[in-house]
């Protein structure tokens, strides 16, 4: 009994020691903020509390893991002691009874779990990450004001998510609008405002070339001058969801961990309200580069910057030479929404499609979830099994509701024209970029039609994209 009491005393001493250190850290270690800062504004106080909450959550995770390890060690010691006691008591066999040490009930170790059981999810130090946002602006003062207000209203921490505004075009009213935000943002101005020399028949595309020039300068500043490890890129015509920052914070470790990922996007190209599942936590891998609020790592930019295109940068990003068979993470419910009807595209794409995309309204705690299912080694087998495990039905059956008793269904396409017919009928995007359909992964596009999950898939022996499909 004395040995049992010693184990318990040590265990409780360790637990009390840990809890005292946590309490001392938060009560005394951080020091008081100067009074003038505390009184500065309610926003700064809110940001500080948010940072404290994130750090506390991380510390609790660490403490919980320590307690688990202590408990495991305790069980090992008790198990060994029980075996020794049984050996002394004429080698009594069988499962040891529950025993009590110093009045604390203990439970004999549970049987060992099968080796194939999933390991506990990896814990990430989210509060230590710094992920800046760069907002690309030009000459729309009201738009940049709206976008910055949206970012600032949802940002949990100024230190963790600093906001940079990169302005092109030299527009004074836009510059004044940015300066209104004072120290809440960092204002950068693209210095090269010279006209771009293009053939006469290409002059109408000059705006696209200026945008590409601006992107390169802005990302060079963020990655090469400031040496940030990751950057979230947005434009000046985006509203962001309440969990925009939470989403990128949670997916950043995956982007670092999985070499088959090269971006995280906040956008679902097929994210119309009637074509999505109302599940804010649902995420996918996608071979299609979506843009419209996306995160990139410095190691990728170092490769892209020297060969950055003079124009049409987004389509260039979608080319196999850049994508290199890597994927992006994208949500079922978009975390950005564009209100920019007028821009270089003259509003055509906005009226036909963009204005119908649904923005997520419900905060989802991604950082408290296990997102390891998005790693390629986990995702691909499960995704293929799910898609090719559901019943295959004709487009006519789906359209006519003859398969409505099925919660999920697959419709097979055999060529480009067949794919376009199916997607047009289901009311989703029909085009390809370098052979990849919007939101496609492993040749598969998914949406919701009349409340039913539909997978638009090639034959199961699919071998890759046809880069000439457009």
Q: What residue spans do the PLM features occupy?
A:
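Cell-envelope/extracellular polymer assembly enzymes that use nucleotide-activated donors
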Residues: 130-132, 162
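A conserved hydrophobic helix/loop-capping motif in glycosyltransferases and polysaccharide synthases
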Residues: 132-140
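Short beta-strand-to-loop acidic/aromatic patch adjacent to the donor-nucleotide binding site
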Residues: 227-239
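Active-site-proximal specificity loops/subdomain of glycosyltransferases
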Residues: 169-229
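Short, acidic, metal-binding catalytic loop of nucleotide-sugar glycosyltransferases
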Residues: 149-161
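C-terminal catalytic/acceptor-binding lobe
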Residues: 5-26, 309-470
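N-terminal signal-anchor transmembrane helix specifying type II single-pass membrane topology
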Residues: 1-85, 102
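Conserved catalytic core of nucleotide-sugar-dependent glycosyltransferases
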Residues: 241-315
């Amino acid at each position: 009994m004395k040995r049992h009491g010693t184990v318990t005393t040590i265990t409780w001493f360790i637990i009390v020691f840990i809890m005292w250190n946590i309490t001392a850290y938060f009560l005394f270690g951080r020091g008081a903020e100067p009074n003038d800062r505390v009184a500065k504004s309610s926003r700064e106080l809110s940001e500080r509390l948010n940072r404290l909450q994130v750090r506390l959550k991380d510390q609790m995770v660490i403490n919980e893991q320590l307690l688990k390890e202590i408990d495991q060690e305790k069980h090992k010691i008790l198990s060994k002691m029980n075996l020794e006691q049984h050996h002394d008591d004429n080698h009594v066999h069988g499962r040891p009874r529950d025993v009590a040490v110093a009045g604390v009930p203990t439970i004999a170790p549970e049987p060992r779990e099968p080796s194939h059981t999933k390991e506990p999810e990896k814990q990430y130090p989210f509060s230590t990450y710094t992920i800046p946002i760069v907002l690309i602006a030009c000459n729309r003062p009201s738009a940049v004001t709206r976008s910055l207000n949206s970012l600032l209203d949802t940002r949990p921490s100024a230190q963790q998510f600093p906001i940079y505004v990169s302005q092109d075009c030299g527009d004074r009213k836009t510059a004044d609008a940015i300066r209104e935000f004072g120290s809440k943002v960092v204002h950068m101005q693209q210095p090269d405002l010279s006209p771009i020399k293009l053939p006469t028949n290409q002059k109408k595309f000059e705006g696209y070339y200026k945008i590409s020039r601006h992107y390169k300068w802005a990302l060079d500043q963020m990655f090469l001058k400031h040496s940030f490890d990751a950057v979230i890129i947005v434009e000046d015509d985006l509203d962001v969801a309440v969990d925009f920052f939470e989403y990128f914070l949670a997916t950043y470790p995956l982007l670092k961990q999985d070499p088959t990922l090269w971006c995280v996007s906040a956008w679902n190209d097929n994210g119309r309200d009637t074509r999505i599942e109302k599940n804010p936590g649902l995420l996918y891998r996608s071979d299609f580069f979506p843009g419209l609020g996306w995160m990139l790592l410095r190691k990728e930019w170092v490769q892209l910057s020297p060969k950055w295109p003079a124009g049409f940068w987004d389509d260039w990003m979608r080319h196999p030479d850049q994508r290199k068979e890597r994927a992006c993470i994208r949500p079922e419910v978009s975390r950005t929404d564009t209100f920019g009807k007028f821009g270089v595209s003259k509003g055509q794409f906005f009226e036909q499609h963009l204005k119908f995309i649904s923005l997520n309204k419900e905060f989802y705690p991604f950082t408290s979830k296990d997102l390891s299912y998005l790693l390629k080694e986990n995702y691909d087998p499960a995704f293929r099994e799910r898609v090719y495990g559901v019943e295959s039905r004709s487009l006519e059956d789906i359209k006519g509701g003859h398969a409505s008793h099925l919660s999920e269904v697959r419709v097979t396409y055999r060529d480009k024209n067949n794919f376009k017919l199916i997607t047009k009928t289901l009311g989703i995007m029909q085009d390809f970029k370098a052979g990849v359909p919007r939101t496609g992964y492993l040749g598969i596009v998914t949406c919701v039609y009349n409340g039913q999950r539909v997978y638009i898939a090639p034959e199961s022996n699919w071998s890759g994209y046809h880069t000439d499909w457009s």
